[in-house]
Amino acid sequence: MMRINARTVPFLATLGVFILLYALCAVQYPAMLSSRVIANLLTDNAFLGVLAVGMTFVILSGGIDLSVGAVMGFTTVALAVMIEGAGLHPLASFTIMLVAGALFGCGIGAAIHWLKAPPFIVTLTAMFLARGAALLLSTDSIPVRHDFYQTVSGLSLTLPGGGRLGLIALLMLLAFVAGGVLLHFTRVGLKIYALGGNARFAGLMGIDTARTTILVYGVSSTMAALAGIIFSLYTRSGYALTGVGVELDAIAAVVIGGTLLSGGVGGMAGSLIGVLIQGLILTWITFDGSLSSWWTKIAIGMLLFIFIGLQRLILQFSAPTGRTG
């Protein structure tokens, strides 16, 4: 008889919840099974998915990153200023922001490691810095009218049934695949899991915890910058207040996806499903038409509470027990 590893239970529960919700929604609204709706579900949640990729790295390492929403907002407004104000080509602007995001994240990781400061405090500080910098650039929404944006918006992969999977959705899926490969098939991934499992023991095992911590937050901020690029392409504008509170949505997606808040357990597949659950609930409410979109937050809060409780039970039952006698 095959035994199920207790640490895979959160992921299996997440998968079961998604399948059940999708089935119930499809029974009520058969159009949910169309490739158009599926493509829209992926496209509309592409920026959140990319944020969840970076957040998965951070939470797996035992940390937290509250700055990703602000970095995303700063990226959108900085892109608009560079493209519309300075006349830079979008590709050059994208490159600048990805590098800036990586450097910003590495600075966060370095501060956390060398100052021995809690990730919550350091990333909260980084959130204020990034949001303040965005507001210094502009307090208004800046439209981006470059022809490149128009061209990119027309790029898509046609699915059976007529659905069109946009470039930004493909970028999100590529980010999840790349993140999964890095976590599960490289030594870097092993170091991240070890750091999240027990940072002290990871250091005793010879793992460079400083480099790993810096890498993790560098990846997170790079993904936040990429999310800003995706959102800029999606809305064709830049706004300093973009992404307010979205870091909490990313954390919720990762935790609902089965990654333990304490670190060391989880994966990319679960985070993707966590993102899709959030998108599915919002789509269901939109189809219904009689409910406020704020019900999405209530539903996600309830799911988050349930999954955190499930995590506590798993940690309790999987913890080694002492023997007497």
PLM segments and residue spans:
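Single transmembrane alpha-helix segments in multi-pass membrane proteins
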Residues: 21-30, 35-86, 110-116, 254-268, ...
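Alpha-helical transmembrane segments within multi-pass membrane transporters and channels
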Residues: 87-127, 273-274, 278
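Transmembrane alpha-helical segments in multi-pass inner-membrane proteins
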Residues: 224, 234-301
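Cytosolic-side transmembrane-helix boundaries in multi-pass membrane proteins
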Residues: 1-23, 27, 197, 204-211, ...
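Structural signal for alpha-helical transmembrane segments and their membrane-water exit/capping regions
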Residues: 17-33, 61, 135-138, 179-187
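Transmembrane helix-bundle core of multi-pass membrane transporters
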Residues: 5, 119-188, 212-215, 235-243, ...
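Hydrophobic alpha-helical segments embedded in the membrane of multi-pass proteins
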Residues: 45-54, 70-74, 103-106, 125-128, ...
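Helix-loop-helix "hairpin" substructures at the membrane interface of multi-pass membrane proteins
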Residues: 89-97, 103-108, 159-238
